[in-house]
A protein has these predicted regions:
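Conserved small-residue-rich beta-alpha loop and adjacent elements
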Residues: 1-88, 92, 155, 277
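Conserved NAD(P)+-binding/catalytic subdomain of aldehyde/semialdehyde dehydrogenases
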Residues: 38, 87-193, 198
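Flexible loop/turn segments at secondary-structure boundaries
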Residues: 47-50, 74-78, 103-105, 124-126, ...
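NAD(P)-dependent aldehyde/semialdehyde dehydrogenase
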Residues: 182, 188, 198-292
Length: 292
């Protein structure tokens, strides 16, 4: 068998030499005189995979011991995580604890905790870092500990217009609908606003195809806290919202809010994350596709 050589083009930031780059790689494994660091991980409640990713990253990429507080939404997974990570728990580099916001606040402010990582909403992050809106506006954090976070947001789906075939249009509409339906819309990366070109001759047909594709999925349980409130807030602000599918007890129908006015920059759909099975659509005006 002939030996194969792999080649890659590596780009470095301006001012960073090859020597600098090599020196900074795997730094935690080169420095033998590091001070111990305790990382508090406030686990995600919506996607269990994120919990494992976070603690593994802290342990093996950042060389920090981990105190994981399970989210009350999926704390039933705690015993399974303890079983999977038992060797690390036995060595004393990982420990799981349980509780809600009160316990989380206590741990964030505990003097033994050096750094914090969380997965959640911007509201939770602000509560941890600033406490009140006044502190946030004045940029007065409650804690000087490093706090990293994976937060949600108003994620756009930017549709590039073109002379799509019927099959292409239907396939892309299915992709957008599935993206929302995944985990009932309770993902930080779920689509929240579909952005289209107003003069695209397939605009109306595409939006209709997304609606049809979403209707192929049954309504899902609104298992995440405050989902019903998010749903109600958006529907109260947009009477033209289209409810898709029948919802049983404890379920929420899928919702598409069409024709958002892009000039209304403070619209709830542009400013707030709809953490449920809901998204909106807005059409931008431009003379041509490059302008769009």
């Amino acid at each position: 068998m002939k030996a194969c050589k792999a080649f890659a083009k590596v780009w470095l930031e301006p001012g960073v030499s090859e020597t600098d780059a090599l020196a900074s790689q795997a730094r935690i494994y080169k420095d033998k005189d590091q001070a111990g660091t305790l990382a508090l991980v406030l686990g995600a409640g919506n996607v269990s995979m994120l919990v494992s990713c976070d603690i593994t990253s802290k342990l093996f990429l950042e060389n920090q011991v981990v105190l994981l507080k399970m989210n009350p939404v999926n704390d039933y997974l705690g015993p399974l995580i303890e079983e999977a990570y038992r060797p690390l728990i036995q060595r004393g580099v990982l420990k799981l604890v349980y509780g809600g916001a009160k316990e989380g606040a206590y741990l964030v402010n505990h003097p033994s905790v050096d750094v914090v990582h969380m997965t959640g909403s911007d509201k939770t992050y602000d509560a941890i870092v600033f406490g009140t809106s006044g502190n946030k506006q004045a940029r007065r954090p409650l804690t000087m500990k490093p706090v990293t976070a994976e937060l949600g947001g108003v994620n756009p789906v930017i549709v590039v217009p073109g002379a799509w075939t019927e099959a292409e249009l239907r396939e892309q509409a299915k992709q957008v609908a599935f993206w929302l339906a995944l985990n009932a819309g309770f993902n930080c990366l779920s689509p929240r606003v579909i952005v289209t070109w107003k003069k695209w001759d397939l605009h109306d047909k595409f939006v209709s195809a997304v609606q049809d594709a979403l209707g192929q999925y049954p309504a899902r349980k609104a298992y995440y806290p405050n989902a019903q409130r998010f749903h109600n807030d958006f529907l109260s602000a947009h009477k033209n919202a289209i409810r898709i599918g029948a919802a049983g007890e404890g379920d929420l129908p899928w919702v598409l809010i069409p024709d958002l006015d892009p000039a209304q920059k403070n619209d709830i759909a542009f400013r707030s994350e709809a953490f449920c099975g809901l998204f909106a659509e807005t059409a931008l005006d431009a003379a041509d596709v490059p302008g769009y």
